Curated annotation (Swiss-Prot):
InterPro entries: ATPase_Vma12
GO CC aspect terms: endomembrane system; endoplasmic reticulum; endoplasmic reticulum membrane
Topology of the protein relative to the lipid bilayer: Multi-pass membrane protein
SS bond list: none
One Pfam short name: Vma12
Protein name (record): Vacuolar ATPase assembly integral membrane protein vph2
Amino acid sequence: MLYRLSEKQQTDLRCNKLTVDGFELVKMLKELRLHNRNINFLEFLRGVQIVPSDSVFLGEIDENSHTQDNTTTSILKEKELYDGIPLLPSMAGVSMDPEREKKSELRLMKNQISAIINILFTVVGTVTAVWYCTSSLSIEKKIALCAFSAILVLVADTFLYVRYLSAQPVRTSKNHTRQIIYTWTTNDPVLQSNEQLAIELGAIPSLKEKKNQ
């Protein structure tokens, strides 16, 4: 798999070639990580582009080949050569999948509907219990007690539900160290081999936490 770099990326990676293969890119990223531990890989790798290997000759790209980008993209998707590209948004822990966002919204709506139904059942059950427990009282007093109980239960359940939604996420204890590990697998059609890039960023909130030994 071949990757086209921007001028800024070439400068930062100290590379004089416009295109590099997967192994070269992995090696240069490791070296860059050693020199600059505060680098934001999400921003840095945003402009990396995949190019077909047959459009590269002696390390140079034919600038007119950009007109074939749509066709090239379709071919690459069919050949499943995007193994290394989905990591670009995920390296910062950001999900760009609209399908996942849609599922999250549907899940939230489902939870809200379930909460409303549960609150209604609680109110109806409370009113029914109060009505039968006060059978010896007059109708006016029974109605007043039922109304008071219904309002009290409704306010309490609504308060608890809103409190639950606004609750802060649980924080990890101080005896944990935060560690994030990114794994990048590149399938290079030229070399027919795989290599993994593991980058540890200690200062960024973790996707995987490990206890202090």
